[in-house]
Amino acid sequence: SIAAPDEGGSLRVGPRSAGAQPGPIAYGRGGTEVTVTDANLVLGRLSAKHFLGGTATLELEAARDGVARLAADLGLTDVEAAFGVLRVANATMERAIRVISLERGHDPADFTLVCFGGAGGMHAADLAQNLGIPRVLVPRSAGILSALGMLLADYVRDYSRTLLVPTHELVSETLESALRNLETNAVADFASEGGDESDLVLERTLDVRYRGQGFEIAVPFGNAFVETFHEAHSRRYGYSDSSRDTEVVNVRVRAVAKRARVDLARADLEGPDASAAVIADQVMLGLEGEESAKLLDREQLRPGNEFAGPGLVVEYSTTTVVPIGFTCRVDESFNLILEPGAGK
């Protein structure tokens, strides 16, 4: 995402993006506008010499020059400008997390933040701290987690039909007939792709709403689906009204065929000493000055290893930032677990 002053002189991050070509200034491919990647690099949250597992080098001085130009436009110091870029980017991600948690009746404190993608690990701890999420899980090979998920995911197809019928006028046979027709289509499609019907699991749901609303809530099909809707509405929006008329907008069938599960690598826990994974010192810039951090090679970290921030864990597909005030440990599945704890 590109960072630049808006028409009013305030810092805006995104939605414009430098993409992969030309990419961030630090890529050295002709990019001229500061991106979140450049800000992370300038602040020492990326290692210029260990990008892509050490197979590529980022242009730190070029990124610094770009951030300096942005800082001058904003009337800030270089460090303030770089931190501003990260804060604006984090605020955007925080809003997205709130939409799928707090606004749906879920407390972020009850969950673990799983981060993935090349940049996920650089922002996850800050997001968790700001949202009150108690821990962060960085999967092994986090940068390619989506690709791995695609290869291992179950076969899923969704089918739907619009009814838009008030529930008090609805005849159960009408629902059953509509759902059976969708299931017939699902089975036929699966068979046409060489699937065995015995491997298919069919899940029925209904989109229900109060009459007059412009949005629906999906609830499992069953004899008590109206009561289930009231309960779901209360959880998500903080209220429900059993005296109001409801209506079924859509009937849905999800066809799922489970794939064989793949056993990912696991290992017994070893000791907490992570010093064998330390490959260099890293200077990280804060608003109050420099911070001395450790640079660790994720491939050398073993289950049971643990260290306190600040630190950077580098690997081919991503970098994980462990800020001051967080500890990082490796579990039996080689996941990194970041939690608030004793930092330096």
Model-derived regions, located:
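C-terminal, non-catalytic interaction/recognition modules in large multi-subunit enzymes and RNPs
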Residues: 2-13, 18-22, 27, 34-35, ...
